[in-house]
């Protein structure tokens, strides 16, 4: 039997949820209840609503994105680079019983001050599908990421995503 879990991408303006049994997605849902659009509801209430009939206390929930920011449910501290890919899963922030937020990543050097929140989970998926030394991650806040087989070394946010949107 493969483990059942819920994956959440909870950004500023949208919330997307997937129910998995192992590697198979059983169902997905989405909402416009991003962390800046809760309209007076608590994050716990919004989570309960979007995962209704999916979850018992034993079903883990792993969330990524702005839910871990200073405007989200609870701050999940950034993981500074360089960092091992495995460090991401070891730095989860608990927000409830069997509910966690994945940390974002940060770079702080004289030539680069940058953060990502949510894209780190896309990076884990990209690495699992096609290991590389450079990852180009399109989206609203497009990232270029430099890594090796074990570690993430650097990333840059580039304007191309904003130009597209």
Language-model regions, residue ranges each:
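Short glycine-rich, Thr/Ser-proximal phosphate-binding strand/loop in the N-terminal lobe
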Residues: 4-42
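Short amphipathic alpha-helical segments
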Residues: 19-20, 74-76, 147-150
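Short beta-strand-loop/turn "lid" adjacent to the catalytic site in phosphate-handling enzymes
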Residues: 54-116
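Glycine-rich phosphate-binding loop plus the immediately following alpha-helix
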Residues: 38, 106-165
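Short, well-ordered amphipathic alpha-helical segments that serve as non-catalytic structural scaffolds
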Residues: 41-54
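Short glycine-aspartate micro-motif
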Residues: 5-9, 60-62, 133-137
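Gly/Ser/Thr-rich loops at beta-strand to alpha-helix junctions
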Residues: 11-16, 67-69, 140-143
């Amino acid at each position: 039997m493969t483990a059942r879990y819920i994956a959440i991408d909870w950004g500023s303006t949208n919330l997307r949820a997937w129910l998995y049994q192992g590697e198979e997605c059983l169902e997905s849902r989405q909402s416009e209840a991003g962390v800046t659009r809760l309209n007076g509801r608590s994050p716990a209430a919004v989570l309960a609503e979007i995962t209704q009939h999916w979850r018992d206390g034993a079903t883990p929930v792993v969330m990524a994105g702005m839910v871990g920011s200073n405007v989200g449910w609870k701050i999940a501290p950034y993981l500074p680079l360089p960092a091992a890919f495995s460090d991401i899963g070891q730095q989860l922030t608990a927000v409830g019983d069997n509910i966690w937020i994945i940390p974002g990543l940060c770079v702080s050097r004289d030539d680069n001050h940058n953060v990502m929140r949510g894209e780190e989970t896309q990076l884990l998926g990209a690495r699992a599908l096609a290991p590389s030394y450079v990852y180009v991650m399109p989206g609203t806040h497009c990232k270029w990421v430099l890594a090796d087989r074990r570690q993430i070394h650097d990333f840059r946010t580039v304007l191309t995503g904003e130009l597209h949107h």
